[in-house]
């Protein structure tokens, strides 16, 4: 229920009914601006959570918007009226629908009753004209096959009229029950007492005499529109009088939904006009309103409203909302629209356009190339100099504010010449202004224009040098675009500049259509579209002149582009006032010349600069006005113009009169629509040059009249600032910028390279030696253009076509949908944007993606650890896992790395004798140097690690007589510390090769992996390096043993053969070299080509060392070293094999557990699927049962057209195979069945016996009190029951014959224009 609070902000007008209606709407909206209304008795309201800004942000406490049948309304929107049993007539197909029409303070929308889908929406600001169509509607409900339990008490008579009266009562009760089921879905409570009263009323109607048929038929008519007192009471709560629509209403209370069952009567004017429109229900005449709603965006819809209180009130509300004369700006819905911003505010469209930033981008200010020529003046900061100009604009630097003030008085509306754009390469400027006030001379205006003409521009010279600015040769083209019919009393050259006073200026007259010619062309176009014919329509469009006006605009645009881009001359555009055609032409020139304006952001800047800031009269041209800023008069003549005022006057003849402003009918013109249409033409001629698509332009046109945003309200920037629109309303640019990533708004063929815009301006280099003058040939111009092309588009004026997707949109209406965000999407014109103007992405739920993510996270540790040795040691792969699986994955990686190190050491120890060894791709540069200088033996291991290459040098030198063992020295303490630690462990192995030491090594490795969990992947590569170093050490030991044996042999031979020592030494050295090559080959598997040269040098050094060591004594400790190496290798192999077996067992167990879990999950999913299937089957069965109990309707719509002689019919099933809808036109209105006329005469003659029962065939709203009094009246009609029985017995013979004919008619596809007598008897 709405709250009944009074507000002081609303001003009521006693003379205008619309003022009171909109004022109450605004007062209610002010109350509900911070809290959404809740309508508890008409339809359920559900909370709808909008998508949050981020997943991490909390849910803010916000008032939830209202929901109607699972459809979300906009914030600040509430329902005014609900109308049941409305027929939505399709214009192209036969998918006519029966549903409910909702009217809110922003729009009206239609929801189908059977499918619960949103079919159509129309914003209140889009309403242009509502026209009544002549014709009638026939609705017939078939009999149900299943009996109803509520009809068991129908046999209260002991008469023999069961064949007729019981059938009628069954039909009545079934239609009542079905309709109550439909309407009860909108309510929250039921009233069984009233249902019982109505059923008792129907059961007792069998005792009536002559008024029997009338009572039954009247109750059946009530079953269509007012099926039962319970549903009727609910309808009256929402539809009877939610707001006082009388013109004399002066109350200040907000609209409320009355809980009392009150009824109102319709006006006599509407009754007289709708006398020919009838709605037949089971053969009983019922009036209907067939309405054709014409919108400003060329959309056409047709509704058929029931001719009762609710239908008439809905029609009156449409007429009142169609009036565009508002008493106050608070009556606009844009002032009530209040999206929730929360803590994080989205983009603010009011602050998007910054004139200083835009002029800096062009290079007019803030740049060394042009900052000395132009300046930004703030003389109009309070809108005193010109009320329709912006606060900041560009003028020449040499013009003072005094001269500017004098020049403004010489132009219409003080709109003096102002620079708005400069060419990037030629530096030619584009200016705009209005025409002069008279023929008198103004020196200040001449100085201003000369300063604009003398601006620095770049022209080609005769020499092949860099082009220089030339001021003396510059000419300024003054483009006069007013039409010849704009000043009929004077010549076309009046109020134009005198060339004698404006030196080096040329005037070009281009006659563009004025606002009156545009309006006439739009009217012709709308008539052709309303009566569209595929054969003649395209030729008739050419006769409207709309396409000719578009081609004229493109031709003048192309001519100005040649002056700016090809010739390098500045241009000044002006018309009479400079806010209609000047805006069109200036915007189109900049759109073709500057690629930045062809993007979404650039196009918004272009409209904000050229249209909004320079004072285009959006509200006046759209036919809207506010009484506070304009005077209102009554417009009684209707000339059929395509404006809101004309539509009001045309409707006033049929319904009620409305008030409009005098300027609304004469000053309306589709100026902005024509500009958007030309932009669409350019997108088709240059499909890769625009970032936005056709739907982007359609959204802008949709909100031109929707009154949802404050962007296009009022006529100037001053008026918007005075009415606080930036703070009280939302900007359309907020919606477009938040939804700019939407695929429907983007052009998939857009080439971004052509639209890359740099902020700095560049000088034009000389590319041709031919100067460009007025006598330059076209080839020379094209050569200059091609050499200095910057994405300039030259349109084709002849390639103009009709924008069929916009002007013929009624042929492709939006698809019906049941999604909760559908109503918001239709209201905004953009999908995937919520009511808070925040874009959200479509959620794609897939079970496989979730399972695959969990499976990949568990298996990534094993796969990455297995294949990590194929990568370089400095590459690291960090996997994101869940917190519960991190420990398991780390343990797996550590164990697997240990097993791999043991296995690799095993393989390497077994393959040392082989010449070719395959190893991982680890590139390490190693050099081996061994030197001996003294008789003592000292072993030194030095490991130097450098980046990017690791070099390990092993030096065997004897410098001191003592034996010393030194550890490694490192240069980088990051990764190489682990290698040094491993080398220390290997040295300990040489000293104590026992089993305890091996266990200590393993413990040390475990401690290392536990202390460095993040470097587990690095340890694998480091361990490989350790194993390689251990092999190198073993090979060195073998070499030492061989050398010692040779020394012993040489000492024995010296005693016997002293002379042959030198020869033997040479032979022995050769043998030693061959033995040294074999271990060196095993080392070269990980060396690069650079290390081979170092090995050859080391061999020469070994030969010299062996010669010096021949005289030394042998060392007996060599045998011990050989035994230690064999024991360590055998123990490492056995321990590694055991660890591998344990790891494999653990992995197998884990795999089994994972398989069991997956099987359990699959079983659970199967159970869930089965449950869901069972639920769906149950729901379908319940729906089928409900549909069987509901009546099935046949709708026949007959539109009267005297021009057509033959009837045209179209059929299609609505709710079942037996039901059908047929729509056809006929020259004659079908008459009633003669039996029905007999019934009417009988009802008129039996007025005394019928009591308070309404006997008129026309449907009128019968009070509930009359329905409750029927039982008392039935008791008084027992005397005439015998006569009724005799009449019914006479009709028994006719029923059997009529049933046969009725069955045959069910199989036919169409109905005759006039009902046959047999059908009438069957229905009776």
Swiss-Prot record:
- Where does the record place Basic and acidic residues bias? 883-894, 988-1002, 1144-1193
Q: What does this protein do?
A: Phosphatase that acts on lipids with a phosphoinositol headgroup.
Subcellular location as annotated: Cytoplasm
Could you give one GO CC term from the UniProt record? cytoplasm
GO terms (BP aspect): phosphatidylinositol dephosphorylation
Q: Which residues form the active site?
A: 575 (phosphocysteine intermediate)
Q: Which organism is it from?
A: Dictyostelium discoideum (Social amoeba)
| Record field: compositional bias (Polar residues) | 181-194, 223-247, 1005-1024, 1079-1090, 1234-1243
Q: What is the name listed in the Swiss-Prot or TrEMBL entry for this protein?
A: Myotubularin-related protein DDB_G0290005
Low complexity: which segments have biased composition? 144-180, 195-222, 248-276, 625-664, 852-864, 899-914, 927-973, 1025-1043, 1091-1109, 1244-1258, 1265-1294
């Amino acid at each position: 229920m709405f709250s009944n609070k009074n507000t002081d902000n609303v001003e009521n007008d006693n003379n205008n009914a619309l003022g009171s209606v909109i004022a109450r709407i605004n007062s209610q909206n002010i109350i509900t601006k911070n809290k959404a209304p809740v309508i508890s008795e008409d339809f359920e309201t559900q909370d709808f959570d909008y998508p949050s800004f981020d997943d991490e942000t909390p849910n803010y406490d916000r008032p939830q918007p209202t929901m109607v049948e699972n459809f979300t309304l906009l914030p600040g929107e509430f329902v005014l009226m609900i109308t049941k049993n409305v027929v939505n007539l399709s214009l192209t197909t036969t998918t006519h629908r029966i549903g409910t029409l909702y009217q809110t303070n922003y729009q009206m929308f239609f929801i189908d009753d059977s499918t619960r889908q949103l079919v159509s929406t129309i914003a209140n600001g889009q309403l242009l004209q509502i026209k009544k169509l002549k014709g009638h509607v026939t609705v017939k409900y078939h009999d149900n096959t299943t009996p109803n339990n509520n009809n068991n008490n129908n046999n209260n008579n002991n008469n023999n009229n069961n064949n007729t009266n019981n059938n009628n009562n069954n039909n009545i009760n079934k239609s009542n029950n079905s309709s109550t089921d439909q309407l009860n879905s909108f309510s929250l409570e039921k009233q069984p007492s009233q249902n019982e009263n109505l059923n008792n009323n129907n059961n007792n109607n069998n005792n009536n005499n002559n008024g029997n048929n009338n009572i039954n038929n009247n109750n059946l008519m009530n079953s269509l529109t007012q099926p039962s007192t319970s549903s009727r009471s609910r309808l009256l709560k929402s539809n009877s009088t939610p707001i006082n629509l009388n013109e004399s209403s002066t109350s200040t209370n907000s609209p409320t939904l009355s809980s009392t069952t009150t009824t109102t009567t319709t006006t006599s004017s509407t009754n007289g006009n709708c006398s020919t429109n009838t709605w037949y229900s089971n053969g009983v005449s019922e009036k209907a309103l067939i309405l054709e709603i014409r919108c400003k965006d060329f959309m056409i819809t047709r509704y058929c409203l029931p001719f009762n209180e609710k239908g008439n009130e809905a029609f009156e509300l449409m007429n009142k909302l169609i009036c565009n004369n508002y008493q106050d700006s608070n009556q606009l819905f844009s002032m009530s629209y209040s999206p929730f911003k929360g803590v994080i505010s989205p983009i603010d469209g009011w602050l998007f356009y910054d004139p200083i930033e835009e002029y800096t981008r062009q290079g007019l200010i803030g740049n060394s190339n042009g900052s000395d020529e132009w300046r930004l003046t703030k003389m109009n900061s309070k809108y005193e100099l010109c009320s329709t100009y912006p606060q900041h604009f560009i003028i020449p630097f040499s013009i003072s504010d005094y001269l500017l003030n004098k020049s403004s008085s010489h132009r219409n509306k003080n709109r003096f010449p102002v620079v708005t754009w400069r060419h990037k390469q030629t530096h030619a400027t584009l200016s705009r202004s209005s025409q002069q006030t008279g023929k008198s001379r103004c020196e200040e205006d001449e100085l201003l224009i000369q300063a604009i003409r003398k601006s620095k521009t770049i022209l080609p010279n005769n020499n092949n040098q860099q082009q220089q600015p030339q001021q003396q040769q510059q000419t300024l083209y003054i483009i006069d675009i007013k039409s010849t019919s704009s000043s009929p009393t004077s010549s076309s050259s009046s109020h134009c500049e005198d060339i004698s006073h404006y030196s080096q200026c040329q005037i070009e007259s281009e006659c563009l259509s004025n606002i009156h010619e545009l309006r006439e062309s739009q009217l012709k176009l709308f008539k052709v579209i309303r009566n569209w014919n595929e054969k003649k329509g395209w030729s008739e469009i050419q006769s409207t002149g709309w396409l000719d006006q578009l081609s004229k605009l493109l031709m003048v645009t192309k001519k100005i582009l040649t002056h700016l881009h090809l010739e390098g001359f500045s241009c000044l555009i002006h018309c009479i006032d400079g806010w209609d055609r000047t805006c069109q032409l200036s915007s189109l020139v900049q759109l073709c010349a500057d690629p930045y304006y062809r993007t979404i952001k650039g196009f918004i800047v272009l409209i904000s600069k050229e249209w909004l800031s320079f004072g285009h009269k959006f509200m006046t041209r759209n036919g809207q006005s506010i009484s506070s800023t304009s005077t209102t008069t009554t417009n009684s003549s209707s000339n059929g113009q395509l404006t809101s005022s004309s539509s009001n006057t045309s409707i006033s003849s049929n319904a009620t009169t409305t008030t409009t402003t005098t300027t609304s009918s004469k000053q309306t013109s589709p100026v902005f629509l024509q500009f958007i249409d030309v932009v669409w033409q350019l997108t088709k001629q240059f499909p890769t040059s625009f970032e936005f698509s056709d739907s982007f332009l359609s959204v802008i046109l949709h909100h031109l009249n929707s009154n949802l945003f404050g962007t296009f309200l009022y006529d100037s920037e001053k008026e918007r600032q005075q009415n606080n629109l930036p703070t009280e309303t939302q900007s359309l640019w907020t919606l477009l910028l938040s939804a700019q990533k939407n695929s429907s708004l983007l052009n998939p063929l857009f080439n971004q390279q052509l639209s890359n815009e740099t902020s700095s301006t560049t000088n034009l280099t000389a590319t041709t030696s031919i100067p460009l003058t007025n006598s330059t040939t076209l080839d020379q111009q094209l050569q200059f253009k091609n050499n200095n092309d910057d994405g300039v588009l030259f349109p084709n004026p002849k390639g103009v076509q009709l924008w069929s997707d916009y002007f013929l949109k009624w042929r492709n209406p939006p698809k019906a949908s049941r999604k909760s965000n559908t109503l918001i999407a239709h209201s905004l014109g953009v999908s995937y944007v919520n009511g808070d103007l925040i874009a959200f992405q479509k959620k794609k739920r897939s079970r496989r993606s979730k399972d695959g993510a969990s499976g990949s996270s568990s298996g990534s540790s094993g796969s990455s650890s297995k294949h990590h040795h194929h990568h370089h040691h400095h590459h690291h792969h960090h996997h994101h896992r869940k917190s519960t699986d991190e420990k398991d994955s780390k343990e797996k990686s550590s164990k697997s790395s240990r097993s791999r190190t043991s296995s690799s050491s095993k393989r390497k120890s077994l393959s040392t004798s082989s010449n070719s060894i395959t190893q991982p791709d680890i590139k390490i540069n190693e050099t081996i140097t061994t030197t001996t200088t003294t008789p003592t033996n000292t072993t030194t291991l030095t490991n130097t690690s450098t980046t990017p290459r690791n070099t390990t040098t092993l030096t065997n030198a004897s410098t001191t007589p003592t034996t010393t063992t030194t550890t490694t020295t490192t240069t980088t303490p990051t990764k190489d510390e682990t290698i040094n630690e491993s080398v220390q462990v290997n040295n300990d192995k040489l000293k104590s090769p026992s089993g305890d030491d091996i266990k200590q090594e393993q413990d040390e490795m475990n401690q290392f992996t536990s202390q460095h969990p993040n470097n587990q992947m690095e340890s694998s590569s480091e361990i490989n390096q350790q194993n390689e170093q251990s092999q190198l050490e073993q090979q060195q030991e073998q070499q030492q043993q061989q050398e010692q044996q040779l020394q012993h042999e040489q000492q024995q031979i010296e005693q016997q053969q002293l002379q042959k020592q030198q020869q033997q030494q040479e032979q022995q050295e050769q043998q030693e070299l061959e033995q040294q090559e074999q271990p060196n080959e095993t080392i070269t598997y990980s060396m690069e080509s650079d290390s081979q040269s170092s090995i050859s040098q080391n061999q020469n050094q070994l030969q010299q060392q062996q010669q010096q060591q021949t005289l030394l004594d042998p060392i007996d400790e060599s045998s011990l070293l050989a035994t230690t190496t064999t024991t360590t290798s055998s123990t490492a192999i056995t321990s590694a094999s055991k660890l591998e077996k344990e790891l494999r067992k653990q992995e197998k167990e884990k795999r089994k557990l994972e398989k069991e879990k997956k099987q359990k999950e699959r079983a659970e999913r199967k159970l869930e699927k089965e449950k869901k299937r069972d639920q769906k089957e149950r729901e379908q069965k319940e729906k089928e049962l409900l549909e069987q109990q509901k009546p099935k309707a046949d709708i026949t719509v007959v539109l009267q057209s005297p021009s057509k002689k033959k009837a045209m019919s179209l059929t299609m099933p609505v709710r079942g195979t037996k039901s059908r809808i047929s729509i056809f036109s006929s020259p004659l209105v079908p008459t009633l069945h003669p039996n029905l006329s007999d019934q009417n005469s009988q009802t008129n003659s039996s007025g005394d016996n019928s009591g308070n029962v309404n006997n008129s065939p026309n449907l009128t709203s019968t009070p509930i009190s009359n329905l409750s009094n029927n039982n008392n009246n039935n008791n008084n009609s027992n005397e005439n029951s015998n006569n009724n029985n005799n009449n019914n017995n006479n009709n028994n013979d006719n029923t059997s014959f009529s049933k046969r004919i009725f069955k045959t008619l069910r199989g036919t596809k169409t109905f005759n224009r006039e009902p046959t007598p047999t059908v009438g008897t069957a229905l009776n």
